[in-house]
């Protein structure tokens, strides 16, 4: 394998996980903060807010998992090498 392709694949894998985690991390923090604020204002709506929060957190985390899948495919099933 060409060492330049190998090095670029490792760098791209790290960047894909890192960049894929930035947006969902910010979104999850914001969503959790807003949910806590909503629960503080209306404690009787805690169950509904918590359920909606957990569902939305799962959807946000899926974006990070897609970045991990891209990184793993670059590391172990690299499409840029001729095998």
UniProtKB/Swiss-Prot annotation:
Site (Reversibly protonated during proton transport): 61
Membrane topology label: Multi-pass membrane protein
This protein's UniProt keywords: ATP synthesis, CF(0), Chloroplast, Hydrogen ion transport, Ion transport, Lipid-binding, Membrane, Plastid, Thylakoid, Transmembrane, Transmembrane helix, Transport
Pfam family name, one: ATP-synt_C
Further remarks about this protein from its record: In plastids the F-type ATPase is also known as CF(1)CF(0).
Binding partners and assembly: F-type ATPases have 2 components, F(1) - the catalytic core - and F(0) - the membrane proton channel. F(1) has five subunits: alpha(3), beta(3), gamma(1), delta(1), epsilon(1). F(0) has four main subunits: a(1), b(1), b'(1) and c(10-14). The alpha and beta chains form an alternating ring which encloses part of the gamma chain. F(1) is attached to F(0) by a central stalk formed by the gamma and epsilon chains, while a peripheral stalk is formed by the delta, b and b' chains.
Protein name: ATP synthase subunit c, chloroplastic
Record organism: Diacronema lutheri
